[in-house]
Amino acid sequence: ILTALDMMNDGNDWIVDIDLEKFFDTVNHDKLMTIIGRTIKDGDVISIIRKYLVSGIMIDDEYEDSIVGTPQGGNLSPLLANIMLNELDKEMEKRGLNFVRYADDCIIMVGSEMSANRVMRNISRFIEEKLGLKVNMTKSKVDRPSGLKYLGFGFYFDPRAHQFKAKPHAKSVAKFKKRMKELTCRSWGDSNKIGRAHV
């Protein structure tokens, strides 16, 4: 968040917010293994990773082979996904773009709307053609910082400080309050049950 703020306050106040559609479910096995194979030369390790990827999933109590995606909840899945998206990082660095990424949540910051639209087109094409992933164009957008929600934070311009700042996004706060209320009500209900049981 602090890195994003530094970039915004350096004049990069147009945001390219790219949403990857069902990222963990759509990782292309062949492309991922090609990337891994550039670094790992041990055939046994490659074989183990490949077996992990195709280990299958349970859908409605039925076993199905997995031909794409990484196993949900698997210990290796976040690491393998990050290896895939590291290729995106390298491409954006090569293009000299200002960006921050956490897992599959990535935003790019540029200096003009025209640049933002061009980056949206080019990076979306790279993601789909080179990485074999799907960009959700309905959720992806070009926006200003005030319209952005990233990792639970919203951004606003402070005219007195002459800079962008961040604070917990209103939707994140509302979600947190709702969750706390649910937990409190549940705890209160359990306490009442225990109290009645002792009477």
What annotation goes with each model-predicted range?
Residues 54, 130-196:
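A conserved non-catalytic segment of reverse transcriptases
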